[in-house]
Amino acid sequence: MNSIEFPLLDQKTKNSVISTTLNDLSNWSRLSSLWPLLYGTSCCFIEFASLIGSRFDFDRYGLVPRSSPRQADLILTAGTVTMKMAPSLVRLYEQMPEPKYVIAMGACTITGGMFSTDSYSTVRGVDKLIPVDVYLPGCPPKPEAVIDAITKLRKKISREIDEDPISYQRENRSFTTNHKFDVGRSTHTGNSNQGLFYQPSSISEMTSDTFLKYKKVQYPATNEKVN
């Protein structure tokens, strides 16, 4: 078709055709439809819940909250994470398909917050358990700050390369020292003798002398009645 005879047609064609790469198209589709898994445990999550309302309306960013980690590509942690909750959080993260992203929301999630000063069971930073892409400080952060964190994550996704996106994410994430979990069987004996903590997991593997040694617990005699 002769473009000289149809100048208007040629002008419309240039304005309606977009040339791009498959990598950019893939990044655009992922950043425009993030499906978050909401892992909220404290007051920070209340601030995130306000985004669902009509004032902020996070649906315009393509965010669709999911209840299953297998359908989510973004996990948003908000609130205090304890040592007892840590294995569940790691399990949820491992069940998410690649590529996946993490936003740490609030001081308690990032550093442990005020609960980490005198608590032995508080995880001092969720990045000790799972890699974090965006840190969102605040106590609690405002809904506008959450939108800003999502915008920064979208910009990060748009710059990802197509060669190996999974390794690219892992190389560009911040890690700190991981917690070491020693799984043991607790015994409520009434005193500080916890010798069964690191014994074999099955009682059948113990010798009879070892079992009877910790089985016999001497309680002080008392005549007081407890109401």
From Swiss-Prot:
SUPFAM superfamilies xrefs: HydA/Nqo6-like
Cofactor binding note: Binds 1 [4Fe-4S] cluster.
Record's subcellular location: Plastid, Chloroplast thylakoid membrane
Annotated residues for binding of [4Fe-4S] cluster: 43-44, 108, 139
UniProt keyword 4Fe-4S present: yes
GO cellular component, one term: respiratory chain complex I
E.C. number: 7.1.1.-
Protein name (database record): NAD(P)H-quinone oxidoreductase subunit K, chloroplastic
Family: Belongs to the complex I 20 kDa subunit family.
InterPro entries named among the record's database cross-references: NADH_UbQ_OxRdtase-like_20kDa, NADH_UQ_OxRdtase_20Kd_su
Membrane topology field: Peripheral membrane protein
Catalytic activity: a plastoquinone + NADH + (n+1) H(+)(in) = a plastoquinol + NAD(+) + n H(+)(out); a plastoquinone + NADPH + (n+1) H(+)(in) = a plastoquinol + NADP(+) + n H(+)(out)
Subunit structure: NDH is composed of at least 16 different subunits, 5 of which are encoded in the nucleus.
Main location: plastid
Organism expressing this protein natively: Pisum sativum (Garden pea)
GO BP: any one term: aerobic respiration
Keywords: 4Fe-4S, Chloroplast, Iron, Iron-sulfur, Membrane, Metal-binding, NAD, NADP, Plastid, Plastoquinone, Quinone, Thylakoid, Translocase, Transport
